[in-house]
Amino acid sequence: MRALVVEMIERVKPLGRCEFVADFAVQMPVDLFLRFVELPAEDRPLVRGWIETIARNPDREAQIAAHAASYEYLSAVLAERRKRPGEDIFSRIVKAEGEGKICPVDSVSMGLNILFGGIETVTSALSFIVRFLAENPAHRRELAQNPALMRDAVEEFMRRFGILNLGRTAAADFDFHGVQIRKGDRMLLPIHLYGLDESKFDRPMDVDFHREHFRHINFGSGPHRCLGSNLARPELRVFLEEWIARIPEFSIAPGDAPKGHSGAAMAITYLPLIWAA
């Protein structure tokens, strides 16, 4: 993991600038994930394309097509793992099949959750973190001067910058604090607001690497906890350690500005950075 992160940073460092989302944030999680599950690097454009379509393309037909293509792709991967299992997570899933713990349909669904959960959220988290640090030099220098803070910094960034909103469909008419909800209405539930609750956090909108606790539910909790959380955390920490060590001073390119969108997933889509090469 660390070697790949360093390689990617060293690739952009001499340039003195980059569009962080396209040049880094959308690439690093995919490359790391493909290595983690022992899939060929050549599949990156396919995987990235499906994720981009499902997460950001408003065309419902395009989303359905991307879901179908990714389902077919992963079904083939799992079929191959049944013939030639290894030590990767997909091989462990098909092993659980053989032990009667899950069925083949559940295997594909679980694999897709890992695939999409382990990539898009990291892309968005990287972009929110880097934008904040580009605009807040005191926090940036605090991390540079005290690398031991990196682990807590990841948790604080995850608390402050939520990524996912849960979509739900109302099963019946009801009144919610004066708002009329009708059966069939679609709603977005911003679960990240838990981390911004003033009754639980002092100055919740501020980023503070020295909080007593950084409790958040951006990865869910209990049996529905995100399967990719144990990969996302070290990815973000290693990125912070290596980026700050190599490019400690950076900022938003003058005359330019970040762009983003909200919806089921919060994301920055454009982040122009500069630094002294």
Labelled PLM ranges:
Residues 1-277:
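Cytochrome P450
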